[in-house]
Amino acid sequence: MANIKAGKERTKIFGRGSHECLLCGRKQGLVRRYNIFFCRQCFREWAPKMGFKKLN
């Protein structure tokens, strides 16, 4: 019983789990370039609306 932490858990301030998607909250597959912080699924949906174009 001595191993139980008292108080709230520490939040992650760096690394892969520290950021999340601004739209859905997912932490995996983030597009962090240009400070977008969208997951790849949300980025595919919103990229044309933001002005990104798919090249061949």
Swiss-Prot record:
NCBIfam families: PRK05766.1. This is Small ribosomal subunit protein uS14. Binds 16S rRNA, required for the assembly of 30S particles. Binds 1 zinc ion per subunit. Keywords: Metal-binding, Ribonucleoprotein, Ribosomal protein, RNA-binding, rRNA-binding, Zinc. Part of the 30S ribosomal subunit. One of its GO terms (cellular component) is cytosolic small ribosomal subunit. The keyword Metal-binding applies. Its cofactor is Zn(2+). One of its GO terms (molecular function) is zinc ion binding. GO terms for biological process: cytoplasmic translation. Zn(2+) binds at C21, C24, C39, C42. Signal peptide: none annotated. Belongs to the universal ribosomal protein uS14 family. Zinc-binding uS14 subfamily.
